[in-house]
């Protein structure tokens, strides 16, 4: 028998089942994550129950400041459909001058075969509550749109993911949702690679931020940890037969083409994308006189864990984008 269970709005993940009961992680759009107990051991006509067992703490953010995602479908490479979540600026205490469109931050997710989730992401809300629009791009290769879409990225990493991030920004500018003159892109890990490729091989963005991102595919193939040591064979091409492809798609080998300011944020204990990825790219860009910032964090690996590190990195990135894009910021209150 089946017992229907009324579920709250949001995503469910991390399912664990036993004895007619199910534990799931509940990920709503405007509230902290929670653990739900779903109990279906009831008479069929009564239905089941969903009980919240624990949640990730109180939300220290005014609900009125939470931007809700809009599902966006836009033309990607070669006319195929691509997907994203668009978050407009949201802060009831502030309004843009009449006729002014918001600056845009393009977010390129990691994986690279991960996905953009509509679940509450406080890093996205950090930007939208400060007057930025954010588009979280589910570029070709992202999970959640079927096998064919997922496999588009095979042998095409550094191409289709980049093209879709560029296309998302252009689309939002073309339909009048964002300011075409104030476009930035950011990403971490594989998303940092997509970010650096977008800045190197396209001239659309005015600034970028690479969080422990890849600059040199050849070095990544040599240096990364064992678990992902053959991952690039599928994403880029067989190693070492495709070495010229690796070099052609590595921002470090084409640093002369990158012409906008970039901020790099790196954990010094990172074993997945070692610090030399950021350090060699920073040196190459500084050698050509570009505006570059580099923040290295002791005791941080691949993905920052310490609250102080995350806060420092976000505030530095925000200040960097504001300077580059010519956005005035209010002085801190006493």
Indicate residue ranges for each PLM-predicted region.
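An N-terminal hydrophobic leader/cap segment in hydrolases
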Residues: 27-73
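Conserved beta-propeller blade repeats
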Residues: 8-25, 59-62, 68-71, 123-125, ...
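Short acidic/polar mixed-charge low-complexity motifs
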Residues: 11, 31, 47-49, 78-80, ...
């Amino acid at each position: 028998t089946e017992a229907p269970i009324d579920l709250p709005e949001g995503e469910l993940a991390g399912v664990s089942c036993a004895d007619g009961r199910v534990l799931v992680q509940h990920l709503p759009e405007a509230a902290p994550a929670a653990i739900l107990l779903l109990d279906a051991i009831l008479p069929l006509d009564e239905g089941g129950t969903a009980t919240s067992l624990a949640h990730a703490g109180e939300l220290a953010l005014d609900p009125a400041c939470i931007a809700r995602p809009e599902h966006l479908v836009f033309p990607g490479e070669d006319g195929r459909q691509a997907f994203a979540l668009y978050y407009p600026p949201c802060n009831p205490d502030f309004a843009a001058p009449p006729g002014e469109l918001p600056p845009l931050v393009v977010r390129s997710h990691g994986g690279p075969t991960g996905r953009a989730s509509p679940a509450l992401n406080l890093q996205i809300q950090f930007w939208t509550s400060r007057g930025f629009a954010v588009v979280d791009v589910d570029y070709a290769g992202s999970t959640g749109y079927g096998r064919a879409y997922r496999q588009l990225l095979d042998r095409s990493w550094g191409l289709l993911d980049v093209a879709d991030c560029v296309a998302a920004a252009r689309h939002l500018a073309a339909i009048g949702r964002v300011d075409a003159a104030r476009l930035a892109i950011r990403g971490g890990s594989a998303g940092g690679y997509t970010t650096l490729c977008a800045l190197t091989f396209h001239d659309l963005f005015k600034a970028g931020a690479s969080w422990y991102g890849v600059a040199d595919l050849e070095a990544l193939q040599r240096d990364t940890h064992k678990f992902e040591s053959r991952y690039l064979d599928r994403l880029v091409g067989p190693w070492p037969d495709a070495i010229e492809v690796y070099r052609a798609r590595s921002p470090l080998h084409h640093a002369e083409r990158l012409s906008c300011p970039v901020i790099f944020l790196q954990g010094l204990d990172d074993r997945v994308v070692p610090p030399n990825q950021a350090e060699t790219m920073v040196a190459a860009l500084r050698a050509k006189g570009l505006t570059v910032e580099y923040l290295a964090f002791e005791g941080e690996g691949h993905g920052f864990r310490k609250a102080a590190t995350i806060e420092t990195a976000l505030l530095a990135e925000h200040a960097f984008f504001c300077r580059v894009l010519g956005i005035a910021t209010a002085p801190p209150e006493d």
